Amino acid sequence: MAGITSTVGFNAILAGATKTVSHPVKSKLFGLRLCVPEFSIVSLSPYHHRRCPAITCRYGGGGGGGSRFPGDRRGRQKESEDDDSLDISAIRSATVRLIDDQQNMIGLVSKEEAVRRAEDAELDLVILSPDADPPVVRMMDYSKYRYEQQKRKKEQQKKTTRMDLKELKMGYNIDQHDYSVRMRAARKFLQDGDKVKVIVNMKGRENEFRNIAIELLRRFQTEIGELGTEESKNFRDRNLFIVLVPNKEVIRKVQEPPPKKKKKPADDKVSAANITATQDI
């Protein structure tokens, strides 16, 4: 409940000698709070009128009528702004290159026809390339498109900011098949941007084969190659391990699609019959 504050001045009819109040006067009565600061009153006559300090009254309320939560934005309505990608009126060209909702190229159509087709399909007409000649537009469910875009963006941010640690365990005498399975898993984890910890557990008398386990880990690191770089290792305790960190530069090159080969123009082949006919002429 908002508080009500009021300041009231009044004239008091005082009688008697000088009276000094050395401390503030406060009173609460049925939610009414009275506060009178320190003051002195001198009466010169039994019915002398003397101006008294003002009394500040406050009823109810919290902290001055303000919000209980200073930074609270609840209840604010977000202003919706029209996306430029939907502003078809901004296209000055009379024709556009239209793509349907299945990403099939329809071709050149008038701007009015593109709008009509989108309305008939109950879809949005979105501008993909406003600077192209003619501009490229596409029919789609724009809200769904934006949702998927934001979802992909969040997933990419998680991959760039978060790096999980994946563990791969194997024995010093692991067979080739199991070794290959762990190698493929390590490559996949590194390409996904995660660290890989390769562990070889030495139990009991297996500690005698420590050198074999160390050679196994070094071989594993060598076969990973530039895809992962060594972050840390431990070849002293019973649990031998090596931690590999993804090499982002190498992974980026691996994930890039290979460049398309340019088709060589077919050489004009002249048949022997044509050569013979030319010579006869």
From Swiss-Prot:
Keyword Transit peptide: yes
Effect of deleting the gene: No visible phenotype under normal growth conditions.
Localization (cell): Plastid, Chloroplast
Gene Ontology cellular component terms for the protein in this record: chloroplast; plasma membrane
Residue span of region Disordered: 63-86, 253-281
A GO term for molecular function: mRNA binding
NCBIfam families, sorted: infC
Record note on quaternary structure: Monomer.
Family indicated by similarity: Belongs to the IF-3 family.
Protein name: Translation initiation factor IF3-4, chloroplastic
